[in-house]
Amino acid sequence: MSSGGLLLLLGLLTLWEALTPVSSTDRPEFCELPEDSGPCKGLFHVFYYNSDQNQRLEFIYGGCYGNANNFKTIEECKRTCAA
């Protein structure tokens, strides 16, 4: 396959992955964790997945510790934890 064909295939696979929602059975367990600002005093606007409301919500992260249900962008949160 030519390099142009490989690039096209890679682009199509990337687009498919971005547009395919994650089912609740495929959702990582950390998506069920509550928001956790951590003990530090930073003021970082980040997002977490609220499994009770089935929504992606913003919260203030202190900058350390916390848990894995913490995303820099709403798009990253959606890709990882979308229902």
Curated annotation (Swiss-Prot):
This is Kunitz-type serine protease inhibitor nigrescinin-3. It comes from Cryptophis nigrescens (Eastern small-eyed snake). Disulfide bonds join C31-C81, C40-C64. PROSITE patterns: BPTI_KUNITZ_1, BPTI_KUNITZ_2. Serine protease inhibitor. Expressed by the venom gland. InterPro entries: Kunitz_BPTI, Kunitz_BPTI_sf, Prtase_inh_Kunz-CS, TFPI/VKTCI-like. Belongs to the venom Kunitz-type family. It is found in: Secreted.
